[in-house]
Amino acid sequence: MNVNNPNQMTVTPVYNGCDSGEGPQSVRGYFDAVAGENVKYDLTYLADTQGFTGVQCIYIDNAENDGAFEIDVEETGQRIKCPAGKQGYFPLLVPGRAKFVARHLGSGKKSVPLFFLNFTIAQGVW
């Protein structure tokens, strides 16, 4: 199993017109794996070291890929599925520690840009 290294992630301040506890922020996740391989994202390190808490939304850019992209919230069992050739914002149910498992269901090795957000954006897929 490929485990995403949180030491290679950084928190980026963003502005959306509202105030959360630490201010609106995003974390760029790097998904780069072969089809069916699970990649774990444990954002608790970022919560402990950089104050990134309360993940509420994820942006998934699966526009360039031939299969669906899935990401599961470990604590709640919620599964988000972004169809092949699509991208969008998806609300997340993360009541506590932000831990996720992602996979791509297409063929070959794929890269899928992800952004974890600590604020909400209305769901939209295009």
Curated annotation (Swiss-Prot):
Subcellular localization, as worded in the UniProt entry: Virion
Pfam families attached to this UniProt entry: PRD1_P5_spike_N (PF08948)
Cellular component annotations (GO), alphabetically ordered: viral capsid
Keywords: Virion
Domain of life: Viruses
Principal location: virion
InterPro entries, alphabetized: Phage_PRD1_P5_spike_N
Reported function: In association with P2 and trimeric P5, forms the spike complexes located at the 5-fold vertices of the capsid. Essential for viral infectivity.
Protein name according to UniProt: Penton protein P31
